[in-house]
């Protein structure tokens, strides 16, 4: 999974770091489903070069994956940072363990293959940025980022993140294109949108799901150890009955929900609840829901929470795109799609001579850790020997 470097490099007010979601509005996200002129990857990188320049290492190709150049800056960023992470968390001698070396190599391969695939797919499918998106989410965001670091921002990024300014911007472009590829495939009108809707609809139908909205009129809270009084229960019933009468008289059910519903979970389920008989809803709620026909409204249904007024709704493909099941199916399908596309990409041999400086840089860091470790051990041994000698003299 890609992570935006703009977020990981962003300082909080107390000098730390924070994860920042890169949110774009739906109108902009859907730009790639229309025929408007967009800034595609190659044009975006020309604009990046105009803004921050490009070092030789930013253009130096060390291998090709799927016909896409992997540059030295790109390879170095992952190789050096991953080496440091492995050394910091698994020990300076991690390279002596085959399983760790295999994990390291797999992580490098996955990162480079993913970035190459993003470039390849965005080129093939014409996925890019509107001018406003590019100016706001890339260029202006970059300006805001480096403003936090002052005049020495370039050296700071190099020292802390092992990254050039050119590749920093390229990485952010790739991160946002990754999200846009997903939107291109799964937003309404996307290549895989109808397939995922059908998969989700089939799942609901095959597993006997219902969809309902409800109005909960809650019992009043009672202090621990006390019980709800008959008077409190009657007052709640009367209020719920008045709302039920409004619903049966034809008043808009959604408007009644907005006005009277006391279910805290309703806000995160605006299109209703989808469930089958294995769900954790109370049995009375489930029984009443399954007894209804589509469009029918229940009588008052009592549970430990209060009184429910339930309306059963149809399960159709227009609404299921907002369900957790649709999202889960989309994510699973996207993973499969990415894995399949990665498997199709051919790779040229890595030019090991060209990347040797990055390897040396990573090894230098590991050697520093080893030296610090050895010096600490030596100091401990010397202290122990001195303590032993002093103990003998004391005797």
Where do the protein language model's features map onto the residues?
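Soluble non-cytosolic domains of exported or imported proteins
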Residues: 69-73, 95-116, 128-132, 167-176, ...
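A mature extracytoplasmic/lumenal domain signature
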Residues: 67, 74-76, 133, 216-221, ...
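C-terminal motif of bacterial Sec signal peptides marking the signal peptidase cleavage site
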Residues: 4-8
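PPIase-associated folding chaperone regions across multiple families
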Residues: 12-21, 25-57, 105, 154-232, ...
